[in-house]
Amino acid sequence: MKMTSDLWRILLCVLMGYLIGCISPSYLIGRKKGYDVRTSGSCNAGASNTVIMAGKAAGIFVALFDILKATAACKLGAVLLPELEYAWQITGVSCVVGHMFPVFLGFRGGKGFACLGGVVLAHSAKVFLLMLAIAVLIGFASNYIAISTVSMSVIWPVYYGTTTGNWAGAAILAIPFVPIFIKHTENFRRISRGEELRLSYLWKKDTELDRITRED
């Protein structure tokens, strides 16, 4: 009987987290401005493509929204289903998946970086700042957001498991690594061809676009 009730709780966490993740401010901003974020720029419904298509302010808004929606999903799962041991982890991971594969957008969403950060924030603000610092260091060292994102999808669950001893929870938190890696395979192909926009695009837009144009 307990197994059946736990199964329903898990399914509720998955559904709740997934639907919250499906909320896409990047798509809504694009629609308001007259473009489809799924087919424009880098064809990604996330903060980085919003920067490319709508500017830094819009991109920052999208990043913050995506972070906080994942944090809210985790907290909601923990509050509504306190008897389920891994409620916040399951809800948070489901939110990341919903963000990446939103049913309302034909399963063409973002790449999960900001939402992953929101899950970290739900665990601890201090750990969020630490993971953010590591992500920034990796990003600047590699000059590619894709490398930073995929790296953090591994570093975060390993850190969680190491510091808490809760490796079952860490295993749940590691689930997004697979879809995040798959989502970034084309980025890695472009990196190998020298066609991927570098992180320096954020402050050297014209220079970076010229480089891509020349290499194309």
Regions found by a protein language model. Give the residues of each.
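Cytosolic, membrane-interface loops and tails of multi-pass inner-membrane proteins
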Residues: Y27-A57, R189-D216
